[in-house]
């Protein structure tokens, strides 16, 4: 005779039980005795004030089994349609090398390890993050790079506040060149307003070096041009300001470094180094700077030291800059890093090495050049005569029809304005894609887009990179799968993570996602969608966001939820700004 109910037989709580762990009645009694209470209800009585206690059941859906969750998430992912995206704007297609996907992204030795505050159990992670810093330092030409930030827009905002701390100018104004990604400008504006920073957004004619504490230039720009900003940067620095350059790490493989232009700070996103677009994140951003500004650098910084026996060892350096030590006087409230994504980006550069990165960068630039030549040969005008991976095409009488034709060919373009279309090429772009792009513009390539090849166009000769990059041994020795596999294993063997034992530390980072979550997040329907592709093609992602927001509103009894923060520190700042805005709205801004 069965002694189990149907719910017990279906094991509805099996998913959470296996993930969180079991707790039998004996364990529970012992725990309650240790803390001096009689029951869980008694514990709640002692800890949760009566006035705020919820007396009704939460209006949430019933729990699902692991197989049911899998089926539902696969169905939701199928509602998204990964496209051949040429939208760009800081998000590009990329290929995660299988050896890195299998041995880092899918390996709990890498994704369950804790923030490396204890260097004795973190040497592998610290080594990989030092590699990431070295990649960024080499590509930007600046001697110091941090171990990642949350995203490019946040990094730009952090660079602005860093410039204010470091600048000799007393001006509250900061210049941002108008051809910068719009989402970056938007985040900078949000950050600037409560700090009484006045953003001056415009072209070079709006630049007044004597009346600003710093300036930000994009290299390449959002619409694709490659400008030599060295004269503008020099003028800003002579006037006592700080110069920031937003850049693309793949572009820096071919272009003269930001340091060569005179930049004090360089920021950007490492997403295209092997990290899927993921409908906008998460991705690792970066920041690099000069020795003079090292102590103003936000985020974590891995440094080389020695252990008690005098052997080389790695550790987090200059931690007194960080919020967990310096609190309100910290260099930034954003203490979070994107360490796993930074590791992937660093290993991507290690896997390809300088030769492989140069091959990818040159291919991307050549595809953009071939498209530019094909369009110009058929009467189209380009907005710029320089480019790396992005071209802007004038279509005075039919931009919307070209966009629509592209969508019919499974292509997404950027509508810069009503008469201009942006096209961004990436590692995943093929000659077939190029051919279809030309078709969308009504250009017949006669099945041979190679006829438009022109290797020496797009990059000004004066801005061609001539110095070597990634000269360290690690970037020369891991270009075969078995070498990379062994290197990844050697690094992970130096670490302690949840695949070996519990870690007796507690913080906001100590959340171990079920393996299923990681697997579902890598489905193409979730991983390979651009954040700005048509809403009709990302209904699954929007459903997940809306459903999660609904659950959070019910859990918190709040009327609205903002889903944009990428980390706890982001959320804290967003919350404070929301409170501030509410007070201002009701006349209590002071």
Language-model segments: residues:
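Gly-rich Lys/Arg/Thr-decorated short loops/hinges at beta-loop-alpha junctions or inter-strand turns
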Residues: 10, 107-119, 137-142, 168-172, ...
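N-terminal entrance/gating region of PLP-dependent enzymes' catalytic architecture
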Residues: 26, 30, 45-131, 137, ...
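Short loop-beta-helix segment that forms the pyridoxal 5′-phosphate
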Residues: 117-121, 138-157, 552-575
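Conserved PLP-enzyme active-site core in the AAT-like
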Residues: 154-315, 375, 392-396, 404, ...
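Conserved phosphate/anionic-ligand binding catalytic regions in large, soluble enzymes, centered on
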Residues: 275-288, 292-293, 337-341, 496-516, ...
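Conserved PLP-binding catalytic core of the aspartate aminotransferase-like
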Residues: 362, 378-407, 425-428
